[in-house]
């Protein structure tokens, strides 16, 4: 709410390229779910962000 906006922030189709730093900057949702590269099994918002939130505490729960 630094700028007074209290709504939901969502990226454009595959426009985000970071998980933790994007979440900490205020991104609430990436618009295109799925893998970073086709059928790679890795994603910016999937497992890595979950680990950062629940396992190592990199992303605070309030974010």
From Swiss-Prot:
One GO BP: cellulose catabolic process
Gene Ontology MF annotations: beta-glucosidase activity
Catalysed reaction equations from the record: Hydrolysis of terminal, non-reducing beta-D-glucosyl residues with release of beta-D-glucose
Pathway(s) this gene product operates in, as recorded in its UniProt entry: Glycan metabolism; cellulose degradation
Membrane-crossing segments per the record: none
Active site (catalytic residues): 12
Keyword entries, A-Z: Carbohydrate metabolism, Cellulose degradation, Glycoprotein, Glycosidase, Hydrolase, Polysaccharide degradation
InterPro entries: Cellulose_deg_GH3, Glyco_hydro_3_N_sf, Glycoside_hydrolase_SF
Residue positions with a glycan: 48, 56
EC number: 3.2.1.21
Family the UniProt entry places it in: Belongs to the glycosyl hydrolase 3 family.
Name of this protein: Beta-glucosidase A-3
Organism: Aspergillus wentii
Organism classification: Eukaryota, Fungi, Dikarya, Ascomycota, Pezizomycotina
